Design a protein with these regions (language model features):
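Substrate-binding cleft/loops of secretory-pathway carbohydrate-active enzymes
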Residues: 31, 190-215, 280-284
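Substrate-binding cleft of secreted/luminal carbohydrate-active enzymes
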Residues: 1-34, 41-42, 49-52, 140, ...
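Aromatic- and acid-rich polysaccharide-binding/catalytic face
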Residues: 45-49, 201-246, 310-315
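Aromatic-rich peripheral "rim/lid" segments of glycoside hydrolase catalytic domains that contact
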Residues: 299-413, 434-436, 446-482
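N-terminal carbohydrate-binding/catalytic regions of secreted carbohydrate-active enzymes
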Residues: 18-133, 295, 299-301, 312-315
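Aromatic-lined carbohydrate-recognition surfaces of secreted/lumenal glycan-active proteins
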Residues: 171-199, 263-278, 304-314
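Active-site groove signature of glycoside hydrolases
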Residues: 130-160, 184-190
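Glycoside hydrolase catalytic-domain groove-lining segments
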Residues: 63-64, 68-82, 91, 219-279
Length: 482
């Protein structure tokens, strides 16, 4: 095949979609599996960890280090029962969450790190954490989320003003030592449509002003007593709202954030969003999420920058998959997964692609994150639905780390892999006639980290030189007529 190639820029979606992958309710699932199940990468993958290095039992997970039969609520341990952040002061960057952060970035996604942290740690700890993140490109850091609540350990050991002041302190450290990182302030926002202020608004006003991103967590329905009881009608450990009410409350929160910031807007996200199948049943759960996303699409104001689906695989009923109780390495697909897959393949939630001029080789690709990347696009005319469609990365091309997209379906090529079979695209959506299709290639960092090249932009941008196009094999007939 004689092919031409053009530059292509990947920019932000009208509303970005992020995905939770691991929390107190479930373990991390590798990005190869998630990509195969959902057919596209996300803007960011949300990883949830805690940092309480001054506590007894650290760095053991709280439910292991402080195991007790008397515990009757998920947050009853001395510190938060997330997996523990192994970085920080005297940390180990070969452990969690860094192994997962590299996996996330190799697959063309940004890192969204949630960290609950003891407000009493010194600046030395905060500086170490900030430095941990400098090689991971455009990181979003959600510090002590749901900070106007009462369940997390940082709220139990500090006043709300102290929690808010700590947020501002940590934000300033991040800006000085890791300018590639954006901070997310996640508080309760407007929780009653008749409220004129947000909960603990006075305490958090300064944090609202300094943060990079505003956020609220909203579960349309939630069984917060899980896993210690069963949600039954009339019970006291769950609640149920409507998609419309939840959407209105989130939008009212955004408007109040703007008011507190002198009318100046900032990006607004919902860092945890779902309906709990424990309350609704799994089929209605899927319907509710579709309804909520329809509200996002239909709102002309487009005030929401993105949301995080909580989560991919869950031990309860808050996941696209439920963890198989017989084997935690296996996920049981829920009705929500197919509904969510349809949602994220809607153009409204997909990154915007802009084709540029024809390129000549060698060509340099730039990865500035999932919302700012420059790749190449190869137009290919197909006479009819193919029987074979393969992309070969030979010689020096085999070393590359590549994300590819054709007909809205994404594929990953890891370093040293030489052939990617594109045919799943055409099994699922066969062509009925000849058509020109486009193969897009992007090059996220080879090992998931940016290299300090000494350039001014190294914390944000990673560059990859491609010497030539990969070989494309298309056949319209079987190898033999057997």
């Amino acid at each position: 095949m004689d092919q031409k190639a053009y530059g292509i820029h990947m920019g932000p979606a009208k509303c970005a979609v992020d995905l939770g992958d691991g929390s107190e309710r479930g373990g991390y699932v590798n990005q190869d599996y998630i990509l195969q199940k959902l057919g596209r990468p996300h803007r960011a993958i949300s990883l949830m960890y805690c940092y309480y290095p001054l506590d007894k039992g650290w760095p053991g997970r709280a439910s292991v280090a402080h195991a007790s039969d008397s515990v009757s609520f998920a947050w009853d341990y001395p510190y938060d029962d997330y997996f523990t952040y192994k970085g920080g002061l005297d940390g180990n960057l070969s452990d969690e969450p860094f192994t997962y952060m590299r996996d996330v970035r190799k697959h063309g996604q940004d890192v969204l790190l949630t960290l609950t942290i003891d407000p009493h740690v010194s600046d030395e700890h905060l500086i170490a954490i900030a430095k941990d993140l400098t090689t991971f490109g455009r990181v979003q850091l959600r510090i002590n989320h749901e900070a106007t609540g009462s369940w997390f350990s940082f709220n139990k050991r500090c006043t709300y003003q102290e929690v808010a002041d700590f947020y501002v302190r940590f934000h300033k450290v991040v800006k000085e030592y890791a300018p590639n990182v954006q901070t997310i302030l996640c508080i309760g926002g407007i929780e009653d449509e008749n409220a004129t202020e947000m909960l603990k608004e006075k305490e958090f006003t300064e944090a609202v002003k300094v943060t990079d991103i505003w956020s609220v967590d909203k579960y349309i329905t939630l069984h917060y007593g899980w896993p210690y009881d069963i949600a039954e009608r009339g019970g006291k450990s769950h609640y149920c709202k409507t998609a419309e009410e939840t959407y209105r409350l989130a939008k009212l929160s955004y408007n109040r954030f703007c008011y507190l910031n002198a009318g100046i807007s900032k990006p607004m996200v919902m860092s945890e969003l779902n309906a709990d199948g424990d309350v609704t049943g799994q089929i209605k759960q899927a319907n509710i999420m579709k309804e909520f996303c329809d509200f996002i699409k239909e709102d002309k104001e487009q005030w929401l920058s993105g949301f995080t689906m909580y989560q991919f695989r869950d031990d309860g009923r808050l996941g696209l998959e439920m963890t198989d109780p017989n084997n935690k390495d296996v996920g049981i697909e829920q009705p929500l997964l197919q509904e969510y897959k349809d949602i994220i393949h809607d153009d409204f939630f997909q990154p915007v692609m802009t084709t540029k001029e024809e390129v000549t080789f060698p060509v340099t690709l730039r990865w500035g994150g999932s919302e700012d990347a420059d790749g190449i696009i190869i137009p290919i005319y197909l006479e009819k639905n193919p029987v074979f469609f393969e992309v070969y990365f030979e010689e020096e091309l085999k070393e590359l780390n590549i994300m590819m997209c054709i007909e809205s379906m994404w594929f990953y090529k890891a370093p040293l892999v030489t052939c990617i079979d594109i045919m799943p695209t055409f099994w699922k959506n066969p062509l009925s006639e000849g058509k020109e299709v486009s193969l897009m290639l992007f090059a996220p960092p080879l090992d998931g980290e940016n290299k300090n090249t000494g350039s001014a932009d190294w914390m944000i941008n990673s560059y990859t030189v491609i010497q030539k196009l990969p070989k494309i094999r298309v056949r319209y007939e079987s190898t033999e007529e057997c």
